[in-house]
């Protein structure tokens, strides 16, 4: 088993560059299935386990995929298979994003029910509601969801009960090849939605209104391969903003888009963090003393749920009582118990977490419960006394490229080790003293 070992006490300083956005690239790779003519070439693609997984899904569906030098080339011009099996989908719930493109291209899709981070039920009912509105019949059973349409999908007016990012992306992709116009209301407004729409339009789609609550998609007969560069990862940028603030450091985060970080910036400035927009990105300077604040996660442009656990680590160092309320996902507080292992004064009350600070955290062996919790525990380790050992790094690898190396380059005392290697080293040390 691999683990990351971090020793607290260092101020982080320097420059770090964020990768392309994980939450943008996965639905974009899935949407590449819509192009029945030509190749799609995607640049600024992060080297993440989730990207390898979605690439394998596409290969299983009979697309040709080449991933090298942060570029993915996809040729989906051959006849596609209709089924994405459990062996792939169980690893990552974003695999369900191939359903809309398959339904639009083939008139049928059969997808194993998704996996991914264990943060609540995260149902796909809004995806299926959209497909049904466009004329598809949907069946769920035996661990699969199957959708099929006789003839072709038809444009429809669809209202989402909640501005689900995944549902917005899946329905938007499916609607590009539907007959007629689809109007999607109460749509998600995240920057990743806009990036997907830009990619679809580059392929020849007619998508308007992405980034607003109402998206209009006029169906076309065919989509073609295109070139597209993935937007920077705002969650990775936010994570390094916290790294600067929590250590009282000074970090320039390159390839960050300030407009995508407004809600994070606002809360951190409330806490006393200095944030400067520069041509290269965002510079973050941590204060000597952090102020307590309250945060409520909301759909974009509200505070992102994917930054909740990292901000929790930061608020543990703030002076006073802070509260975080999670409104987007249920069961996203599993990392609270791990913070307690580090001597944090923190408790759960319903859908909120209350923290009293500042905390004198102590290094401990902790387990990452999901992707963002993994980063949060490492951030907490940066300011803990002694050594913090973080396990279950498979979660971290789903969303961060060389996270420990980037932190080390900023001055952190951190390394990633194989448990067996560590045991051998410890044995060698004990042998020397025998």
Curated annotation (Swiss-Prot):
Its EC number is 2.5.1.7. This is UDP-N-acetylglucosamine 1-carboxyvinyltransferase 1. PANTHER family: UDP-N-ACETYLGLUCOSAMINE 1-CARBOXYVINYLTRANSFERASE. GO terms for molecular function: UDP-N-acetylglucosamine 1-carboxyvinyltransferase activity. One of its GO terms (cellular component) is cytoplasm. It is found in: Cytoplasm. Phosphoenolpyruvate binds at residues 22-23. Keywords: Cell cycle, Cell division, Cell shape, Cell wall biogenesis/degradation, Cytoplasm, Peptidoglycan synthesis, Pyruvate, Transferase. One of its GO terms (biological process) is UDP-N-acetylgalactosamine biosynthetic process. The keyword Metal-binding does not apply. Pfam families: EPSP_synthase. Signal peptide: none annotated. The modification 2-(S-cysteinyl)pyruvic acid O-phosphothioketal is found at residue 117. Pathway: Cell wall biogenesis; peptidoglycan biosynthesis. HAMAP family: MurA (MF_00111). The active site is at 117 (proton donor). Cell wall formation. Adds enolpyruvyl to UDP-N-acetylglucosamine. Transmembrane segments: none annotated. InterPro entries: Enolpyruvate_Tfrase_dom, Enolpyruvate_Tfrase_sf, MurA_subfamily, RNA3'P_cycl/enolpyr_Trfase_a/b, UDP_GlcNAc_COvinyl_MurA. The keyword Nucleus does not apply. Belongs to the EPSP synthase family. MurA subfamily. It catalyses: phosphoenolpyruvate + UDP-N-acetyl-alpha-D-glucosamine = UDP-N-acetyl-3-O-(1-carboxyvinyl)-alpha-D-glucosamine + phosphate.
């Amino acid at each position: 088993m691999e683990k990351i070992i971090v020793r607290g006490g260092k101020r982080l300083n320097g420059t770090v560059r964020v990768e392309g956005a994980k939450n943008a690239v996965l639905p974009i790779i899935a949407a590449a299935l819509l192009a029945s003519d030509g190749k799609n070439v995607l640049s600024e693609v992060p080297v993440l386990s989730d990207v390898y997984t979605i690439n394998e899904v596409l290969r299983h569906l009979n697309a040709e995929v080449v991933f090298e030098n942060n570029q993915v080339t996809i040729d989906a011009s051959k006849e596609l298979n209709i089924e994405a099996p459990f062996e792939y989908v169980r690893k990552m719930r974003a695999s369900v994003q191939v359903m809309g493109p398959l339904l639009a291209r083939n008139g049928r899709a059969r997808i194993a029910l998704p996996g991914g981070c264990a943060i609540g039920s995260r149902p796909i009912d809004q995806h299926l509601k959209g497909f049904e509105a466009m004329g598809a019949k949907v069946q769920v059973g035996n661990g699969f969801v199957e959708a099929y349409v006789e003839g072709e999908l038809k444009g429809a007016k669809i209202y989402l009960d909640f501005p689900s990012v995944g549902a917005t992306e899946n329905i938007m992709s499916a609607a590009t090849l539907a007959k007629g116009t689809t109007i999607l209301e109460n749509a998600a407004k995240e920057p990743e939605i806009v990036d997907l729409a830009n990619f679809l339009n580059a392929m020849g789609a007619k998508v308007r209104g992405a980034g607003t609550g109402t998206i209009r998609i006029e169906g076309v007969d065919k989509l073609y391969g295109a070139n597209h560069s993935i937007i920077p990862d705002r969650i990775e940028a936010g994570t390094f903003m916290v790294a600067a603030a929590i250590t009282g450091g000074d970090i320039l985060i390159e390839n960050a888009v300030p407009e995508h970080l407004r809600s994070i910036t606002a809360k951190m400035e409330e806490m006393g963090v200095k944030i400067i927009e520069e041509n290269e990105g965002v510079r973050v300077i941590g204060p000597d003393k952090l102020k307590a604040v309250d945060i409520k996660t909301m759909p974009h442009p509200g505070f992102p749920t994917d930054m909740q656990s990292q901000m929790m680590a930061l608020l543990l160092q703030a002076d006073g009582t802070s509260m975080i309320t999670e409104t987007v996902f249920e069961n996203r507080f599993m990392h609270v118990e791990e913070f307690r292992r580090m001597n944090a004064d923190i408790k759960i009350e319903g859908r909120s977490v209350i923290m009293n600070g500042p905390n004198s955290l102590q290094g401990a062996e902790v387990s990452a419960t999901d992707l963002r919790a993994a980063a949060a525990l490492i951030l907490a380790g940066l300011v803990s006394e002694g050594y913090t050992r973080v396990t279950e790094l498979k979660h971290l690898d789903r969303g961060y490229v060389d996270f420990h190396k980037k932190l080390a380059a900023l001055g952190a005392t951190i390394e990633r080790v194989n448990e067996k290697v560590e045991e051998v080293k410890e044995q060698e040390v004990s042998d020397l003293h025998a």
